[in-house]
Amino acid sequence: MGKDNKKQTMLDQAQPRLQVEGLAGRRGERLLFKNMNFTVDMGEVLEVSGHNGSGKTTLLRLLCGLLLPEEGTLQWRGQPINKIRPLYHSELSYVGHTDAIKGELTAHENLMIAGALNGGGIDPEQALERVGLTTIRELPGRFLSAGQRRRLALARLLVNRAWLWLLDEPFTALDKVAIRTIATLLEEHAAAGGIAIFTSHHAINIAHARTLEISA
């Protein structure tokens, strides 16, 4: 077996785990946090809390590779992320502030495309049902309310099978029923062995979730 094949076998056998050591994040000239350390294992949910501007979004952008760390290391399956980027990105799903919904496509078509690009999860029809959007399946994205767009963006998590969910303020614009629905999806993802990290500026009741507080 070649060296590259051995390395891939070791990665495949290593359990999903995200490890952060000595991480520092900056926005412009302002240092938001430094010497951040935490580990998230299979079956865990981590809520990142803090006031607006504390660095929650910056942290998620660092974790998903949209920003480079000022200092520190990020590891996935025991390997530095910068050495296994294709694998890492194939095993994560990121939902940011912008919902990335295509306005000219229906809700169902948006999920169909997401499933075709990545896939491995449940059927788009089932995903719409899980987030309570079956009645607007044929409505173009440009006509969806802010809450409906948010739920549709989160439904993409269900059609794209990924070990790691990175969610920036996933409960924004949602009513109490929708908040409970999405919280349940996070709990089920963890129960199936997945990892979820989400930001929030107010308390969300998710079973067995840990909290990481970012304070300036």
Curated annotation (Swiss-Prot):
<dbReference type="Pfam" id="PF00005">
    <property type="entry name" value="ABC_tran"/>
</dbReference>
<keyword id="KW-0201">Cytochrome c-type biogenesis</keyword>
<keyword id="KW-0997">Cell inner membrane</keyword>
<dbReference type="InterPro" id="IPR003439">
    <property type="entry name" value="ABC_transporter-like_ATP-bd"/>
</dbReference>
<comment type="similarity">
    <text>Belongs to the ABC transporter superfamily. CcmA exporter (TC 3.A.1.107) family.</text>
</comment>
<comment type="function">
    <text>Part of the ABC transporter complex CcmAB involved in the biogenesis of c-type cytochromes; once thought to export heme, this seems not to be the case, but its exact role is uncertain. Responsible for energy coupling to the transport system.</text>
</comment>
<dbReference type="InterPro" id="IPR003593">
    <property type="entry name" value="AAA+_ATPase"/>
</dbReference>
<dbReference type="InterPro" id="IPR027417">
    <property type="entry name" value="P-loop_NTPase"/>
</dbReference>
<dbReference type="InterPro" id="IPR005895">
    <property type="entry name" value="ABC_transptr_haem_export_CcmA"/>
</dbReference>
<keyword id="KW-0813">Transport</keyword>
<dbReference type="GO" id="GO:0017004">
    <property type="term" value="P:cytochrome complex assembly"/>
</dbReference>
<dbReference type="GO" id="GO:0016887">
    <property type="term" value="F:ATP hydrolysis activity"/>
</dbReference>
<keyword id="KW-1278">Translocase</keyword>
<dbReference type="GO" id="GO:0015439">
    <property type="term" value="F:ABC-type heme transporter activity"/>
</dbReference>
<protein>
    <recommendedName>
        <fullName>Cytochrome c biogenesis ATP-binding export protein CcmA</fullName>
        <ecNumber>7.6.2.5</ecNumber>
    </recommendedName>
</protein>
<dbReference type="GO" id="GO:0005524">
    <property type="term" value="F:ATP binding"/>
</dbReference>
<feature type="domain" description="ABC transporter">
    <location>
        <begin position="18"/>
        <end position="216"/>
    </location>
</feature>
<keyword id="KW-0067">ATP-binding</keyword>
<dbReference type="GO" id="GO:0005886">
    <property type="term" value="C:plasma membrane"/>
</dbReference>
<feature type="binding site">
    <location>
        <begin position="50"/>
        <end position="57"/>
    </location>
    <ligand>
        <name>ATP</name>
    </ligand>
</feature>
<dbReference type="InterPro" id="IPR017871">
    <property type="entry name" value="ABC_transporter-like_CS"/>
</dbReference>
<keyword id="KW-0547">Nucleotide-binding</keyword>
<comment type="subunit">
    <text>The complex is composed of two ATP-binding proteins (CcmA) and two transmembrane proteins (CcmB).</text>
</comment>
<keyword id="KW-1003">Cell membrane</keyword>
<keyword id="KW-0472">Membrane</keyword>
